[in-house]
């Protein structure tokens, strides 16, 4: 996560956490915006600073009528992907990897212990050698905060 941000490169098989968000760095809030989305928004003519601010509160593009559907389908975030789909991706890579695959399975804030147990069981059944789950909002002082993730 953090190293890929510093190096401005992909974080492996992880989907985007958010299209735009505010990151807390040394008690300062900084905007982080996916550069490919920014370029697309400008090229397609729907960019505005006001839109970026709204997207940074939500993280995803869902619910923004001014953004074309084909763009929304490309820029999907980790919270829009089901835990099962996250595990399927990890399992697909695990088939060709001797060691464990590093991948976060994002869970909604309201995820229960049974949801977590189900994710571990599915990962085991799919042949994953390890699994990391993160329930959004479960860790106080999270460096990235979105207003509208459930």
Q: Predicted regions span which residues?
A:
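Catalytic alpha/beta core of large soluble enzyme barrels
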Residues: 2-150
């Amino acid at each position: 996560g953090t190293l890929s941000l510093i190096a401005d490169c992909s974080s492996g098989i992880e989907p985007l956490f958010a299209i735009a968000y505010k990151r807390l760095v040394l008690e300062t809030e900084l905007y982080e915006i996916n550069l490919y989305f920014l370029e697309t928004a400008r090229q397609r003519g729907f960019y505005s600073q006001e839109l970026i601010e709204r997207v940074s509160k939500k993280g995803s593009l869902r619910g923004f009528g001014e953004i074309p559907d084909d763009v929304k389908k490309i820029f999907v975030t980790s919270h829009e992907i089901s835990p099962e789909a996250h595990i399927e991706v990890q399992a697909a890579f695990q088939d060709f990897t001797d060691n464990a695959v590093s991948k976060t399975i994002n869970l909604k804030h309201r995820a229960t212990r049974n949801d977590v147990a189900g994710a571990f069981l599915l990962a085991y059944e799919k042949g994953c050698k390890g699994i990391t789950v993160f329930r959004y909002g479960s860790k106080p002082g999270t460096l990235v905060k979105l207003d509208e993730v459930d």
